Amino acid sequence: MNQTQTRNPVVLIHGIFDTAGIFRLMSAYLRGRGWDVHSFNLCPNYGLAGLDRLAEQISHYVEKTFPPGQPFDLVGFSMGGIVSRYYVQRLGGLDRVQRLIAISAPHYGTWLAYFYPTLGAFQMRPYCPFLCDLNRDIETLDQINFTSIWTPFDAMILPASSSRVPVGDEILLDVLLHAWMVRDSRCIKAVEKALRAPVTINN
C-alpha cells in the first residue's frame, strides 16, 4: 500500500433545481490552478427522475469523455452529492473515482423533501428506503478519499447535521446559506485542498 499525489480530471455534479452554471466560480478557480474541470447538466434537474437514474448520467458522461480506466475525482453539491455517492457505491464508480467531495449533501435526508412530491425528492426524505440502502454500506467510501463539507446554518438540509457521515474527512464552515457553499471562497479552497490530498493505492 502506498500513496500517490495524482491530479485527476474533476467532475462537478450540481443539485436539484440547479445547473452546471452554479459551479462557475469554483470551475474558474480550479482551472486557474491547473485542474481539468468538467461539469454537465443533470436532466431533469427538478426531481422528476430518481437519483439512481441521474447517477447513470455520470456513467454515460464518464464513458464518452475519458479513456477506459482513467481515474477521476467527483465533487457533488447537495443532491449531487447523493447522486455521486450512488455512482460510486452502486454503479462501479469505486473502480475509477479516487476522491469524492460532498458539499452540503443530505446523506441522511432533509425534511424539506416532504414538501416536493417527486421521486427524486422522495429519495431524499429522512429514513427513506433509498438512503437507508445507500447508507447501509457507507463504509465503502473509506476505500477512496471522501470529504464532507457542510454548514450548521443550512436551511435546505434539515437537520444540517444530515450532511455529517461517520467516514472520511469532515470540514465545517460557517456559511449562512445553502446555495452560497459552492461560491464561498473558504469552501472552494477546501475543495482544492481535498483534491490535492494524496490517495492511497492498494497493491
Language-model segments: which ranges?
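C-terminal catalytic-base region of ester-bond hydrolases, centering on the histidine
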Residues: 142-203
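Short amphipathic alpha-helix
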Residues: 25-26
